Each structure stands twice: as structure tokens, then as C-alpha cells.
Amino acid sequence: MKKRKIKAIIEKGKDQRFSIYSKDHFGNSYFGGFGASVAAAKEDFLESVKEAIEEERADGNTVFSIDNIVIEYSYDIPSFFNFFDFINVSRFAEYAGVNESKMRAYKSGVSFPGEKTTAKIFRAVRKIGAELTAATLL
């Protein structure tokens, strides 16, 4: 069966909590999630997707099953480092060619990178992903 993709955006709020929202929806049912961590917000978001499926079915509408839904997450920088907390920010800054103290400020959400710096960070994330994908263990 075909998979239904939901694009979700994760951001750290001024209240230091994480929110997830999406422009995608099932009929009149929209999705959202909140939490003290990205992991908690993802759990809440997934629960809202399940509730939307139930509501649509209760209204007699045909919707995808939860097993046929793929959620594609986009992160702001603070959420990225919250979820992937095993990444050392100082080492990542060096790898990406970004000032270490600025990178810590981006991670905490105190300041935000410009377009060029965001592109550098994105390229570094993609490069790490490619290197990990190409790696094998003996």
C-alpha cells in the first residue's frame, strides 16, 4: 500500500519547550505536539496523528492506517541538538566551520544563524550522514 507522508516542523519555543506542527491534515483533523524534549513532543505529535485517524474514521472517511504513514521531521537548530544529543556541539562546530561559541548560542536558541551559516550547518549534517551511511564495521 502507498505510504502517506506528513511533513512536520520542530521548533524550540521561548518557553524552552518544543513544539511540532504540520500543514498536512486528514480532512478537518490537524496534527500538533508539545513536550519538554523533542522526543516527548514527537510522542505527543504521533498521538495527535492517531487521534486524527480515529476522528476521520468515526466521521466515515477513509484514511491511511498509522503503519502506512511516514513522518518527515524538519528541525530548527536547538531541536536538532536536543534530539541528537550525542553530537558534541564543539566538535560539530569545528567540523562545520562555524565559530564554537556562536554554535552553542544557536544550540541553546539564544541567537540564530544567518542564511549562509545555516547552509554550512546543513551541509555538515548531510556530509556526516553520507559518511555514516558509507561506513562499515568489522
What are these regions (language model features)?
Residues 1-61:
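DNA-contacting interfaces and partner/effector-binding or oligomerization modules
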Residues 2-5, 47-101, 105-107, 111-116, ...:
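Short, charged, surface-exposed hinge/linker loops at domain edges
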Residues 43, 105, 123:
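DNA-binding alpha-helical recognition surfaces that contact promoter or target DNA
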Residues 116-134:
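DNA major-groove recognition helix of helix-turn-helix/homeodomain DNA-binding modules
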